Amino acid sequence: MDQLIQVVEAAQERQDLPEIRPGDTIKMQLRVIEGEKERLQAYEGVIISDSGAGTNRTITVRKISNGVGVERIIPLNSPNIESIEVRKYGKTRRAKLSYLRKRTGKAALRVKERKVSAPAGK
């Protein structure tokens, strides 16, 4: 039974998303439905948490909007995610970056940058 669940989840998991980790700064396009209309909304911030696995994987993205910290928990397998683009790759020593919540201003989003080699063939 457990193997059957794994097979079904693997078939339903999204494959078009980039590899992301806590500390990365991402820009995502989210599909928002307002009444009859549908539009794309950009959301850019730092990943401060990553939890779950497979189809249940979620990330917490934090941004500063008008001086106020805004966090959003987003299921990565959601059909409302149009695209995710990694702006900066962050280098951290923690899996959960909850200490960023105490910071203000530019320091609230400052994470050391890690070097990433370009994918082969590009």
From Swiss-Prot:
Cystine pairs: none
Key words, A-Z: Ribonucleoprotein, Ribosomal protein
One cellular component (GO) term of this entry: cytosolic large ribosomal subunit
A Pfam family annotated for this UniProt entry: Ribosomal_L19
InterPro entries membership: Ribosomal_bL19, Ribosomal_bL19_CS, Ribosomal_bL19_sf, Translation_prot_SH3-like_sf
A GO MF term: structural constituent of ribosome
Signal sequence coordinates: none
One of the protein's GO biological processes: translation
Function of the protein: This protein is located at the 30S-50S ribosomal subunit interface and may play a role in the structure and function of the aminoacyl-tRNA binding site.
PANTHER family for this protein: LARGE RIBOSOMAL SUBUNIT PROTEIN BL19M, RIBOSOMAL PROTEIN L19
Family recorded in the similarity comment: Belongs to the bacterial ribosomal protein bL19 family.
Protein name, as recorded: Large ribosomal subunit protein bL19
Organism in which the protein naturally occurs: Prosthecochloris aestuarii (strain DSM 271 / SK 413)
Lineage of the species this protein comes from: Bacteria, Pseudomonadati, Chlorobiota, Chlorobiia, Chlorobiales
